[in-house]
């Protein structure tokens, strides 16, 4: 891997919640190291307003400009990393040019959360914390000094939080 900024795409089905969380958290956590993007296989057309509230109120991240978009907008783009955050996106993930590192970080779907808005906000926040922890682990990897196969192995293992200690 190079010393330049890495391009990372988070994918989920609707691009309304989990992939948006990943994109905006990574933008905040590593703006000098990564360009963060998100997209969906079948975009919902809007970002979940509770996800925006969580990002703004709990993580203190400005979400102006957040939008649900298709992965077709990125057709031909050469990503360094593609991370799917839902099982459907993993199954239908297209072939990306440039042989990016691909990993699957499955997370609960906020669209399926039940309860009041406040209960849903708490559940979405928990998903955000899970994604943030995985991003922290990604950022702790010495990517610039690792071979591609090792990077892919470690980035994939991040999804299994009980194996965190084995990453270093």
Residue ranges, per PLM feature:
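Short polar/charged helix/loop
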Residues: 1-168
